[in-house]
Amino acid sequence: MRLDELIEYLKYDDLINFKRVDITGISYNSKTTKQGDIFICLVGEHTDGHEYAQMAVDNGAAALLVERPLDNIKVPQVQVDSTRHKIADIADRFYSRPSLGLNLIGITGTNGKTTVTHLIQKIFEENQEKCALIGTLGYKLSSNGEYRDAKHTTPQAPELQATLRMIKDVEKIDNVVMEVSSHSLEQNRVGGCRYNGAILTNLTQDHLDYHITMENYFKAKALLFERLTEDDFAVINADDEYADKFLAVVPEGVRKLTYGVKNDADVMAKDIKFSLKGAEFKLVLKDAEYDVNLHMNGMFSVYNVLAAITSSIAMNIDIKIALKALQNVHGVAGRFEVVNKKPLVIVDYAHTPDGLENVLKSAREITPAGGKLICVFGCGGDRDATKRPKMGAIAQRLADKIVITSDNPRSEDPQQIITDIIAGLQSVDPEKVTVEPDRGEAIALLKSISDNNDVVVIAGKGHEDYQILKDKTIHFDDREQARKVFAGSVI
């Protein structure tokens, strides 16, 4: 594609050294820039792509997207107000607007995005339709397919648009269900994506290191709904504190549907019961009721299933097909995943106050009489520190014993993170509270402090198979560690 064609619809401030050159790719890493790329000079918290522009040109960049003119560089420069926001427009144009030919469904929320995307993919497949999935675990082209790695919940714009084009043209798939993070909305990584539907799971505290306030966090999430157009659909959790605010930003002509357990909604769950086998409830619609039996547990699973069912209704998929699909699902990797039965050991991705509270309440529902609920958890470094004491308080209130350990400490001192967590405890009773900074050792302790009728929750990392330390990233998988510790137990 020629540069003049690439920027035909782009709002730019100036053109420097402009000429018609062929653009054969998009790059924002000077080290991997190839001949014919347009190099995007991204400005971040710690690095400025403008400083690497010459290296990109030396590696073959045919043009630059810049926020300020760069002297002594002879290739064409397109100056814009924000390269971080305009990279999405460039990528969308370069890959010929792939989302326009897709039924693209976006799921946003603090917790539950991954599970809901998987559930909707299953519903499409039960309806004899192909559906690709993009999210935290990577992307995959079918529910039985292999994940391809992802560095972010929502990929960067060039990778995202390239993936959408591949899904449409190469794999011949028309439906895509996609996790949409607040960061990707705020940074416009999903700019250019034309969503046909948007789903809200919930909005609770997370990422305040980035958004600073809950109002800013809400505004970022709301962007997904504000961009919907006539004949699209919006699915909102009616029980969420921010439900009315989300409903208010949905444009006229967009079909609005709600789901919930407590507040009146279009789709509701009543008579909810939990057992070791899973959750069961009565699904209540405006004109019908259905008995639902799940192989997944916890109130959060009920909400996730309601979100998927409501979305299928919005897409005019037969409710019986949706229910058949959901009742055959056994969960998602690292989400309330059972890795041992006696004691019952559950690995979950819960890494927010709300997420931890939900998983512990759900675990309590299935803790046998006389059994203890034990929780191992930590908090990530270089992230919202205000949630640390809150998570400590929640764990102490809901579990009988807690083991405080490291999560992904990153550049922070693990002991300081633990100190922040302990600040939320009412007391530090050594019979009920154990501190072990080494996560592997913390999980190993479970063998000596648990009995067969106990329930153990290892929270925070879920599907992750790595741990990010100050100077390195190591292989670490909570599920592997737990299986080693309880080898020889009933699994």
Task: Tell where the protein language model's regions lie, with residue ranges.
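N-terminal leader/targeting and accessory segments in enzymes
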Residues: 1-89, 93, 241, 268-273, ...
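ATP-dependent carboxylate-amine ligase
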Residues: 1-12, 35-38, 254-255, 310-334, ...
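Phosphate-binding loop of NTP-binding sites
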Residues: 7-10, 87-238, 242-254, 306, ...
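Receiver (REC) domain switch/active-site residues of two-component response regulators
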Residues: 62, 196, 400
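Short, polar loop motifs at secondary-structure junctions
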Residues: 62-71, 135-138, 238-241, 261-262, ...
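Short loop/edge segments at beta-strand edges and connector loops
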Residues: 66, 81, 135, 180, ...
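Acidic, Mg2+-coordinating active-site environments of NTP-dependent enzymes
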Residues: 70-74, 171-174, 186, 195-345, ...
